[in-house]
Amino acid sequence: MSRRKQAKPQHLKSDEELLPPDGAPEHAAPGEGAEDADSGPESRSGGEETSVCEKCCAEFFKWADFLEHQRSCTKLPPVLIVHEDAPAPPPEDFPEPSPASSPSERAESEAAEEAGAEGAEGEARPVEKEAEPMDAEPAGDTRAPRPPPAAPAPPTPAYGAPSTNVTLEALLSTKVAVAQFSQGARAAGGSGAGGGVAAAAVPLILEQLMALQQQQIHQLQLIEQIRSQVALMQRPPPRPSLSPAAAPSAPGPAPSQLPGLAALPLSAGAPAAAIAGSGPAAPAAFEGAQPLSRPESGASTPGGPAEPSAPAAPSAAPAPAAPAPAPAPQSAASSQPQSASTPPALAPGSLLGAAPGLPSPLLPQTSASGVIFPNPLVSIAATANALDPLSALMKHRKGKPPNVSVFEPKASAEDPFFKHKCRFCAKVFGSDSALQIHLRSHTGERPFKCNICGNRFSTKGNLKVHFQRHKEKYPHIQMNPYPVPEYLDNVPTCSGIPYGMSLPPEKPVTTWLDSKPVLPTVPTSVGLQLPPTVPGAHGYADSPSATPASRSPQRPSPASSECASLSPGLNHVESGVSATAESPQSLLGGPPLTKAEPVSLPCTNARAGDAPVGAQASAAPTSVDGAPTSLGSPGLPAVSEQFKAQFPFGGLLDSMQTSETSKLQQLVENIDKKMTDPNQCVICHRVLSCQSALKMHYRTHTGERPFKCKICGRAFTTKGNLKTHFGVHRAKPPLRVQHSCPICQKKFTNAVVLQQHIRMHMGGQIPNTPLPEGFQDAMDSELAYDDKNAETLSSYDDDMDENSMEDDAELKDAATDPAKPLLSYAGSCPPSPPSVISSIAALENQMKMIDSVMSCQQLTGLKSVENGSGESDRLSNDSSSAVGDLESRSAGSPALSESSSSQALSPAPSNGESFRSKSPGLGAPEEPQEIPLKTERPDSPAAAPGSGGAPGRAGIKEEAPFSLLFLSRERGKCPSTVCGVCGKPFACKSALEIHYRSHTKERPFVCALCRRGCSTMGNLKQHLLTHRLKELPSQLFDPNFALGPSQSTPSLISSAAPTMIKMEVNGHGKAMALGEGPPLPAGVQVPAGPQTVMGPGLAPMLAPPPRRTPKQHNCQSCGKTFSSASALQIHERTHTGEKPFGCTICGRAFTTKGNLKVHMGTHMWNNAPARRGRRLSVENPMALLGGDALKFSEMFQKDLAARAMNVDPSFWNQYAAAITNGLAMKNNEISVIQNGGIPQLPVSLGGSALPPLGSMASGMDKARTGSSPPIVSLDKASSETAASRPFTRFIEDNKEIGIN
């Protein structure tokens, strides 16, 4: 696009030509005017010759004009303010003195020092000037056509009558004159000569601007001098002087050049000065120099340095202006922005926003009419206004150059669009009110205060929304719609209620604790009862963390309760606190906070005793709790250690008891420290998403690691990390201790030996010292998070109820496995009563589990294969850890009690059967026996219980599959922890069990208040936090309650029925979820009668627990209850085998669309790594390949590898790398291969890594030799279903049935 020529182009003399294309003309030194003139044509017209005046650097495309100009040109051109009607010729002459003219001459004046800097700027500016011509000045340039490339000729005429709002000011002792400074020019950069160069020049301009900022520091000094000079110079004269100046500076072209820079054609010298001053003033502001906001027109002159064009406001005395440095280019940029801040033309300062270096059409808007600053005082005032915020702004924008954008806000007070512009971020608003609200985001002002909790908001609307939260609890209190000055928050009142508050700050304090439970950074001096929960709290006491507390009031009390629980000090007092803390108000009497007067007391002692009497009164409850709320910093470390374990329960507490006085005092002292976000870390100020995340985050500061591995002693900050870590021990140590006696915990590597050992117990040959019923749970809870009891297993039994409650299901399994070995190693027996009954129950449970496992295996051999853990594996494991698993497995609750009850319900009848099932290794021959067991199972007593004859048995059955899975896991077969539906691997069985609930839609933990179902106890506990503690029925906290999974040992027997119910309800779901699915499903396959029996048995059991009543949808087959018809419908498919959703690729069918979607991901290899659940692990194939004890390596290398030869090499090679890399096929994929005889399956189906299905047949044979029932049944299944559909689908069905 052709560049539009300036009306009065002025050659830019700069050692560094921003635009190489410009060639010599621009490079010419000030003295090279003649040469420049020769080369000029290149730079300006491109096609025309350009003559450059060596004195003023003015460019002329016509020789005649150039000669005429030389006659009148002087080294010190007067300032010329060009009005639109001004004669073109004069402007041309004066523009010549463009700031770029000769830096050397500038040296003549006092500005000499400044001249150096200005010289550079001047050079830059000319470049911009040239660029500007291209862009055309947005402002009043007569060359409005600039947007369209105008022919070179038109520009020339422009010289004659540049109506551009360019003001030329003579710079004393310099040739520098203001050059046109349009934004376009800036954009064009130094493309003075070549239009194409303009764009490239932008970066250069930006760099120069940065340099100019530094130069401006020097300019500021000059500006000060200029100010004084201007003040001395005729302020009134400016205009007159300007007019005279205009006459001498008749060259209108110069103004055209200047318009960009001077954007504000100063009708009066003072205005010009103001503009100029504003330019430098901005820099001053940035630099922290005093803003040149002085109303004096002279003040504006300081801008002169910024804009040569406006160098001397008093045109009459151009000399004073002369000091303005040539740096004008940048200063101009900055000055424009500044002027933008000034009401007039610069108002378009929006261009300033662009100014940062982007060519902003607005920049050129230095409107060409002096009208912009008709009154110098006005412009000065505008400049001053702009500068005031600038200094502050610069502080905020540390790294950002003082781009004009900063000044934009007031740029054009006259321009309605820019009237409401933010001076900090240049955003434009439609109204002043909107702007004022926006400014609060910069200032942090929050004038509207909630009169209930003390939270502050930037707008009344936000306050209204927030206030709705209090309507229910405080319907009688009206919102205070009026702003409350924040400083009043620090002013104590006789009532103890801060200004603008209708209630004492007690609740807010609680909230504060809530929000910052981990680090009660509140100074110990505050005397808040809440113990500095963070060990390092004492260190932080002075830190703003305390303020967060004050802010916390904004947060709901529940959070505060959490905080209380978090506070270490509360740990030992926790129970007491819960009572007292239920409602801080109740404790304190709410109003008592008015005692706040004592709040003024520093309570620096931070000890309850030291607290003021009023504080003590409120503190007393805390002390009663036994937690010195105001624990001194010395106590903090201990507290931190304690609180970690307490977090889960602390959440239930409504709030901590704190003295009203201390609370109020804390509020007062910490108001200034308030944090904007309730979930903000008081130490590093990081904002977390929620309280729980904040709690965990604080551990990074405190170094707290509340979750310790009982095996290796490693500690972790989160329970999840600990669970994941447990997998490390399961993978290998379990290999050494595959089987443990459920009674004496003795370890056996051979399942058969274990069975014999159990028989010895049964025969009385070995003393029965069974693990306490609650041992497993206790272990789980211990592993879960009780640090205090970590050392003593005995305490776990007691703590089990609470601790296990939270994540019973989750941690139990993980903790249980490692826990057993720990106990055995430790040699410490759980203190729970080792009643003979419990031991017998444990033994019977184990036997029953074995039987049920065998029967289940027989019933669903195929299923077992698919389930990812061979039944045989389970069997072997069953004997070893079936009981243990049952115990731990039992829905993370009185599993033992169930086992005992089940034992009573169905005494050892299953023992014989259980004995039949032998370790997988031995099982090869026995597998056939196992199959018979299927038929026998229904008849055998064990079968009946398994079918559900006894709820306890049902639970056992469920547990058995889990235990089997667990055992397989212990063996080191990770596949048991891989979801058979979606292939996601999990670190432990408990995690897998919980995960299966996402497929089965089972939500065994039901809130007694709202009947909402939760998949885990932890989720239920979190949900309970949504209910106020008062609302929760006392029985909720009874271990035997719906939360029963955490029942204590003593109550195990007494609560056997409810427990069993739980187990059955939860356990069945769990068993099914595991995909062992046979336990109950097996019963289903068996005569329906037994199931129905189970159902009836469950019915009475289910009735008692209040949580069961809400579930109205009961499964007729297994008695499970569901909260919705859809969940029941999905569940019923596990009994009917219906799988309406089929995979179009491999033919596998699924019970839910969600499962199908997940499965589809298995066909997309590229996506596998993307999702955690899609990870392929070499171990996964083991589970799928068979339940028997065969190692995957054996199966794969011998069977599959041998078969690989039968497959097309390309088929095998495709996936060889994946397998070797550890990307084992997914369970589903492996099962597909195992299904055997489906060589045609696409590689993508997941048959991938394994040899073709055809090769699997022989592999299957070997598997059979390994006596894996799953494999045996697999053959049958394959023969039966191969013709109709891919074998994978058949297996999937089985698996689905088991899982769902």
From Swiss-Prot:
Residues covered by region (Disordered): 1-51, 84-162, 234-258, 277-352, 523-633, 864-955, 1259-1279
Zinc fingers (C2H2-type) by residue: 51-73, 420-442, 448-470, 679-701, 707-729, 739-761, 977-999, 1005-1027, 1113-1135, 1141-1163
Biased segments, Polar residues type: 577-586
SUPFAM superfamilies: beta-beta-alpha zinc fingers (SSF57667)
GO biological process: regulation of transcription by RNA polymerase II
Positions of post-translational Phosphoserine modification: S109, S919, S1177
Presence of keyword Protein transport: no
Entries under Pfam families matching the protein: zf-C2H2, zf-met
Subcellular location: Nucleus
Expression by tissue: Widely expressed in adult with highest levels in heart. Expressed in fetal brain (in neurons of hippocampus, cortex, mediodorsal and ventrolateral thalamic nuclei, putamen, cerebellum and brainstem).
Basic residues compositional bias, start-end: 1-11
Keyword terms, alphabetized: DNA-binding, Metal-binding, Nucleus, Phosphoprotein, Repeat, Transcription, Transcription regulation, Zinc, Zinc-finger
GO cellular component: nucleus
Listed Basic and acidic residues bias regions: 122-132
Main location: nucleus
Entry annotated with the keyword rRNA processing: no
GO molecular function, one term: zinc ion binding
Free-text function comment from the UniProt entry: Probable transcription factor.
Record family assignment: Belongs to the sal C2H2-type zinc-finger protein family.
UniProt-recorded name of the protein: Sal-like protein 3
Native organism: Homo sapiens (Human)
Gene encoding the protein: SALL3
